[in-house]
């Protein structure tokens, strides 16, 4: 996985936003680190839920906060298609208030953390 996966996923996210005339996400290194920690936690705990999501934003400057989680894919395009086909996840990707993203991946779990000021 690693950086190629994340670069590809950010490109897909930004392409989807461009399709509806939204500005692209800025990749936030702090959110990325927290998304990676969250993905590792979910993987190691064998969980797949949004419980505890707000802890990932503790101390962050973001007014708007959101999380997408996907499971079962290790390919960026497959993850993106899965999330775009889910109304709630799609809403996060296309939420105008979000301007920053961080992505983490562990096992077959992908975490996208979104922030907006």
Label each PLM-derived region with a short phrase:
Residues 32-79, 93:
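Short, surface-exposed glycine/acidic/tryptophan-bearing loops
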Residues 15, 71-117:
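Disulfide-stabilized extracellular recognition modules
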Residues 19-33, 46-56, 90-105:
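Surface-exposed patches in mature extracellular/periplasmic domains of secreted proteins
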Residues 3-8, 25-33, 51, 70-78, ...:
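Soluble non-cytosolic domains of exported or imported proteins
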Residues 2-44, 59:
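A short alpha-helix/helix-coil micro-patch that ends at or immediately precedes a cysteine
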